Regions:
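PLP-dependent amino-acid enzyme catalytic core
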Residues: 1-279
């Protein structure tokens, strides 16, 4: 996923600064993909990896993490971010108890947006000319969109950055927090790495449209993408209508279908949630 980049960047930065060394324990609160990215790096470099992850996140993510040698602690989905039982607070408690353990903390670590400022945005600049007028991306920690937006606005003034945020999250406006099914985007707090000043506007994302579009893209375009990717494409279709002929809109699809085979890909799951489209 897009989070593999920040997993490597955060670990290598901490190593270069002398804060961690192989044999230490890394603990990361995550919705799954950052944990997988860090577990990939931990497996290669010789770190113990502990993941704290809300219950709503897919079984597939847990299976991949275990295959990479990570230890997983599940936490209640309904727990507020600062509640003692939340994935963030459980990680902090474990760090206080385990010697030589570290939370690199994707929510506040500058290496998160830096990975996308230095690499993702550069790849975009290499691949697009000045016809790129709009970028649409989901917002979770905010690292991807913040890093990309900062660099793109430096090089292409006037580019429009659209953030996509689920209903039930506060990142894109509103103060009502409630459960939603799409994974990896949205929060009930504002992560330190998120710079909303770089985001020109938000579009709020309903669950059904997110999963229905993902299923459509799989079936019609052969794009084996995750649920939030479907949501970002749905949002882009709303916003791209205002572009002129020849203008280009880039949409960031952060992960694949692998993590969601027992969720939105499955007709029975979609039907249980009331999301299944009828012919």
């Amino acid at each position: 996923s897009v989070k593999d980049r920040i997993g490597l960047k955060m670990v290598e930065k901490a190593e270069a600064e002398g804060r961690i060394k192989p044999g230490d324990t890394l603990i990361e609160p995550t919705s799954g993909n950052t944990g997988i990215g860090m577990a990939l790096v931990a497996a290669v470099k010789g770190y113990r990896m502990i993941i704290t992850m809300p219950e709503k996140m897919s079984k597939e993510k847990e299976v991949v993490l275990k295959a990479l040698g990570a230890e997983i602690i599940r936490t209640p989905t309904e727990a507020a971010w600062d509640a003692p039982e939340s994935h963030i607070e459980v990680a902090k408690k474990m760090q206080a108890e385990i010697p030589n353990s570290h939370i690199l903390d994707q929510y506040s670590n500058p290496a998160n947006p830096d990975a996308h400022y230095e690499h993702t945005a550069q790849e975009i600049l290499d691949d697009f000319d000045n016809s790129l007028k709009m970028v649409v991306a989901g917002v979770g920690t905010g690292g991807t969109i913040t890093g990309m937006a900062k660099r793109l606005k430096e090089d292409r003034p006037g580019i429009t950055i659209i953030g996509v945020d689920p209903f039930g999250s506060i990142l894109g406006g509103g103060d009502e927090v409630y459960p939603y099914h799409v994974e990896g985007i949205g929060y009930d707090f504002f992560p330190d790495v998120l710079n909303n000043d770089l985001i020109d506007e938000y579009i709020k994302l309903p669950d059904p449209e997110s999963f229905q579009m993902a299923r459509r893209l799989i079936k019609e375009e052969g794009l084996l993408i995750g649920g939030s990717s479907g949501g970002v494409v749905w949002a882009a279709l709303q916003k791209a209508e205002r572009l002129n002929a020849g203008d280009k809109c880039l949409v960031i699809l952060p992960d694949s279908v692998r993590n969601y085979l027992t969720k939105f890909v499955d007709d029975e799951w979609m039907d249980e949630q009331g999301f299944l489209e009828t012919a």
